[in-house]
Amino acid sequence: MHLWQRGVDSVKFSPEKRDIDLRCELLGDRPDRKLVGYVGRLANEKRIDDLAALEKRDDIQLVIVGDGPARMRLERELPTAKFVGYQAGEDLAHYYASLDIFVHTGKHETFCQSIQEALASGVPVIAPNSGGPTDLVKHGWTGFLIDTSNSYSLNHSVDQILKLSEPALMADRARNSVIDRTWEIVNNQLLNHYRELKNKQALAESEKVA
């Protein structure tokens, strides 16, 4: 049995898309803070309200990229967060790369493409230790897998990343962890699996004839 994972566009999503002007716009008169963000659909099952544990921190600015039925409620519950709405294409790539930490809070993901896009952008990831994220994030190496509904664990993980003596190392490891998952590479892997299966079937048929 082989695991076939989705690919990611590592050219579109890249640390090179980090946008100083966008960071200045998001940070306002507090450029000393770090940007911590979520990208995805704003729906109840995504548990974005778990980010309330970070909202009152003075050293970060929360950024919420996306839209959905829970947006109005979340804007009330996270009044200091920056809600920038749905983004796509190059604009989305700039938002990813301009973050210092990406946090995903949904606990029931079969995969999580936004995590791959954040990693490709060279952004450390904090995500639930369940479902799809466990196949993407290497705990302590490219980010942290935790119970994101636990406010202590979430804050502690943010602190660990912000206090890294060489934060660029984790950013590089994040990028390198998905650099071989381009769509071309993963599609070729799938084709190779089909070829292997076809060859095994052909061999089995020839043995029956013999």
What residues fall within each predicted segment?
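Conserved donor-binding/catalytic core segment of Leloir-type glycosyltransferases
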Residues: 29-46, 52-57
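Short hydrophobic beta-strand element within catalytic cores of glycosyltransferases
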Residues: 124-127
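Aromatic "clamp/platform" in nucleotide-sugar-dependent glycosyltransferases that forms part
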Residues: 88, 107
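Conserved acidic donor-binding segment of nucleotide-sugar-dependent glycosyltransferases
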Residues: 139-140, 144-151, 160-165
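Short alpha-helical donor nucleotide-sugar binding micro-motif in glycosyltransferases
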Residues: 86-87, 94-99, 190
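A short, well-ordered alpha-helix in the C-terminal region of glycosyltransferases
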Residues: 166-180
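Donor nucleotide-sugar binding/catalytic pocket of nucleotide-sugar-dependent glycosyltransferases
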Residues: 1-19, 24, 31
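C-terminal alpha-helical cap of glycosyltransferases
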Residues: 183-210
